[in-house]
């Protein structure tokens, strides 16, 4: 993302209003570019990193990154694309997660050129009359144009009043920070457009919108998602990150080069030719090295590649692996997998056990009700590429 053309084209699905944004970028004015992230869990993943890297590209062009940590919006959860209401998340948890977010975010953004605002900064101070005033700025006609709400009604599935407030809250964030541009996934288009409406209602110039594609998850089919557990976390160690990239299907390699690196399009086409010529594994190693290097440096990427080769070419465990202490002498195998962050849900843990993908000290786990005795440290392996030393 070294220039304006790359910024506006790479991984971008739609721009509102493109001509206005191009003129603003050409004007030399310092733009306020907003990106919001909801800290419903502590992890950011490579899908989030794409827009963070877009935001960094704006910074490199001299613009101000305005980062919204949605500790209040996260308590509701974005209803877009969901056929039922999300479970409520405790505000204390979202606040704590937001602080962990920043450690990951500043692996990408320039801290000195970034404004950070939790949206509790304004929502926690609003009284009910102010909430009603905000609600009066958006018509029910607009709300009912949301495809998700229309589909729920058509399927006789309920949606609740608090869900209606999500797009209002995201939009009001833009008012409070006076955003010139907002970044977001295409699936958030309704929320982003609501921001423009609210800015107009509050007498502000409407923000331009840059809407991006989504990154495919590890299966190469569905969107990378925290809820699906198919993600590569920015908190993963170099070895974990490298191994997870190596698990994606060959069909997703070009997509990952486009969305997760700055490799030029011409080079990506050359990589795709090599894949067709049977060099898929080697190209994937180069991809995994490149991605790991972005977040862990060349030294970390090189060591992760060596660990990978040792594990799979020589059938050895990595020399170094992450450690996790549970504070108890016994823990269920499913609980250990979830608490350590190796999986996102009980259903994912059970599925992996059922498929024979979980081992303790090299022994396959066949019982999802197994209780692990941690009187001595053990090696927990999930899948072919994830190893963790666990202890009490």
Q: Language model features by range: what are they?
A:
Residues 1-27:
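N- or domain-start disorder-to-order transition segments that initiate the globular core
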Residues 12, 90-211, 218:
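Divalent-metal (Mg2+/Mn2+/Ca2+)-assisted nucleotide/phosphate chemistry catalytic cores
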Residues 18-79, 183-189, 195:
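N-terminal catalytic cores of NTP/NDP-binding nucleotidyl/phosphoryl-transfer enzymes
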Residues 77-81, 126-132, 220-224:
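Short acidic, glycine/serine/threonine-rich loops at helix termini
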Residues 79-95:
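A charged helix-plus-loop insertion that forms the helical arch/lid used to bind
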Residues 82-87, 132-136, 227-228:
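Short, hinge-like loop/turn segments at secondary-structure boundaries
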Residues 199-392:
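Conserved nucleotide- and phosphate/pyrophosphate-binding catalytic cores
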